[in-house]
Amino acid sequence: MLKFQEAAKCVSGSTAISTYPKTLIARRYVLQQKLGSGSFGTVYLVSDKKAKRGEELKVLKEISVGELNPNETVQANLEAQLLSKLDHPAIVKFHASFVEQDNFCIITEYCEGRDLDDKIQEYKQAGKIFPENQIIEWFIQLLLGVDYMHERRILHRDLKSKNVFLKNNLLKIGDFGVSRLLMGSCDLATTLTGTPHYMSPEALKHQGYDTKSDIWSLACILYEMCCMNHAFAGSNFLSIVLKIVEGDTPSLPERYPKELNAIMESMLNKNPSLRPSAIEILKIPYLDEQLQNLMCRYSEMTLEDKNLDCQKEAAHIINAMQKRIHLQTLRALSEVQKMTPRERMRLRKLQAADEKARKLKKIVEEKYEENSKRMQELRSRNFQQLSVDVLHEKTHLKGMEEKEEQPEGRLSCSPQDEDEERWQGREEESDEPTLENLPESQPIPSMDLHELESIVEDATSDLGYHEIPEDPLVAEEYYADAFDSYCEESDEEEEEIALERPEKEIRNEGSQPAYRTNQQDSDIEALARCLENVLGCTSLDTKTITTMAEDMSPGPPIFNSVMARTKMKRMRESAMQKLGTEVFEEVYNYLKRARHQNASEAEIRECLEKVVPQASDCFEVDQLLYFEEQLLITMGKEPTLQNHL
C-alpha cells in the first residue's frame, strides 16, 4: 500500500506546484504539461519514473487545502488507501495521494480521449449525434462501474459528463471519490462541486445522499448523450434547482427505443426508493439482450487478441531457445542479483574503468597502425627515388668506361647486351637499400611521445572519463568517492537498474516485453468478465447506502469548511474577472436582497439586464450565493436568504 506523504514544512499561503517543465514531484513524477484547471484545483500530465514501459503517463490533480492537522492527514490516508484498491475497467484507476507543500495531490490513470463532455460538445458543434449502439454500449459500461462501486458500499457523489473519461473509446468514471475524500461526511459534497445539472432532488433538499442519487446523475448523463443537452436547464441557478425538485421528468426523442426512455424515466423518479439500482437496470430484458450481444463481441475481440499474443509469444520463445546462454553468464547474473546496491555501484565503476582501458587501447592501436602505414609509404617513395638516381648514375659511368676501353676499330655492343648489363647492375644495387641511404632532406616523420599522449587525452576527454590512478590504494579511494552522499533513496533506484541490466543482456533485441502494452485489450477482457458475471447473477438484493447511516469510514469530516471556502473563493474570483469588481459587487448585493425578499424570476431578470448585457452572465454569482447559504446551514447557523425549496 502506498504511503501517505506529509509535507515537512507547511507555509501559511497557498503555494501551487511549480509549472516548470520536467519538474520532479514527490521524487517520482516528472511534470510534462498542464491539462486544465477546475474549481478544486489544477490537473497536470506527469510521467511516472517507476512505472512499467508504456504506462508512464499519469494524471496529477493538485488541490489547494491550506494547512492540515495531523488527524486530518491520517483520515485522508485511510480513505485514499480504500480508493486505491478499486480495480474495474469502467473506473479510472486511483494510484496514490500525498501532500506536496500545502497541496493535496492525487495520482490517477491517464485517459487520452479527454472527457465525455468534450466529446459531446465536439459532436454538437459538428451537428452530429452518437449512434444508438454506441450510446447503449457506453451506458452499460457506466452501469457496470456504478454497480461495482455500490457493491462495495461506496458512493461517487459527483457523477457528470465532465467526470467521465474516454480511453480507447471505452468510458471510465473519473474523479471517483475525490469529492467524498475532500469533503468528509459533509452532506453537501455534491452541491459544492459545480453546476446543479446532475444533482438529485434529495441532495438539493438535504435529505441524505445514497446510491439512488448516483442513479439520478447517471440518468442525466444518458439524456445528455442522447440529446446533446442537459436534462434540466435554466436561465439561472435557482431555476435549474426548481426544475429538478418540482419540474416534469424529461423524455428522450422518438428516434430512441421506448424501452430506453422508460429506463431513463424510472431512474429520474423523484422518489429515491422507487428508482432501480444499477444491477436491476442491467437485468431489464432490453438491456439484458444488449449485454449478451456485447459479451459475444468482447469475447471475439479477446479471442483474436489472445491468438495474436500466442503467436508473438511463440516467436519470442523460439528466439529465446535459439540464443545460447553460457552457464558462466547465468552464474555471473546470479551473483549480481545477490549484491547490495553499493556493491553494484562499485562493480559498475570497475566496468567503466575496464571500458575506458579498452577504448584507450583501441585508440593507441589505431594511431600505431596509422603511423606504420605512413612510415611505409614514405620509405617506399624514397626508395624508388634513390634507386632511380643510383641506377642512372652507374649506367652513365659504365658507358663512359666502355667507351674508353673499346678499341677504335671495334664496333660497340648491341642495345640488347647493354640492357642486360643495366638490369644486372640494378639487381645488384637493389639488394642493399637501407635507411642510411635515404637523403637527409627527406627525414621520416615520426610521432613524438608527448604528441601521442595529447591526442589520446583529447580523444578520451569527450567520453567524460577522469584519470584513474594506478596506485591500488588511491584507486580504491577513486572507486569509493561517490558513496559519501549515498542514501536509502538511491538504494532502491540502483537496485532497480542493476536488476534491469542483466535482463537486457539476456533478452534478444527484438523480443516482446513480458507485460501487455495495449491497455484496451485488458480492459475489454475485463469488461467481458464483468458482463459474464452480470448475466450469471440472479440475486437482485442490493442494499441502499446512505451517508447518514452508513458512511465510508468513521471519523471527523475532512477539510469541510476549508474546501468549501476554497471553492467559493475561486468562484468569487472567477465572477469578478468576468464582470469586473464594481459590477460584481452590485450584482452580488442585488441578488442577495432579491432572494431575501423572494422576488420573482422575471423581476430579477429585468433588473439584472440593466447592469449586464445578459442575465445569464450572473449565473455564477447566483450560484455563489446559494453555496454560501448551504454552508451556513451545514455549519448549524441560521440562513440569511429565503428558503425556496
From Swiss-Prot:
Its cofactor is Mn(2+); Mg(2+). It is found in: Nucleus; Nucleus, Nucleolus. Poorly expressed in cerebellum, trachea, lung, appendix, and uterus. Its EC number is 2.7.11.1. ATP binds at residues 35-43, 61. Its main location: nucleus. This is Serine/threonine-protein kinase Nek11. Residues 29-287 form the Protein kinase domain. InterPro entries: Kinase-like_dom_sf, NEK_Ser/Thr_kinase_NIMA, Prot_kinase_dom, Ser/Thr_kinase_AS. Changing residue 108 to M: In a colorectal adenocarcinoma sample; somatic mutation. Disulfide bonds: none annotated. Phosphorylated by NEK2. Phosphorylation at Ser-273 is important for its activation. The keyword Transferase applies. PROSITE patterns: PROTEIN_KINASE_DOM, PROTEIN_KINASE_ST. Interacts with isoform 1 of NEK2. CDD domains: STKc_Nek11. The modification Phosphoserine is found at residue 273. Keywords: ATP-binding, Cell cycle, Coiled coil, Kinase, Magnesium, Manganese, Metal-binding, Nucleotide-binding, Nucleus, Phosphoprotein, Serine/threonine-protein kinase, Transferase. It catalyses: L-seryl-[protein] + ATP = O-phospho-L-seryl-[protein] + ADP + H(+); L-threonyl-[protein] + ATP = O-phospho-L-threonyl-[protein] + ADP + H(+).
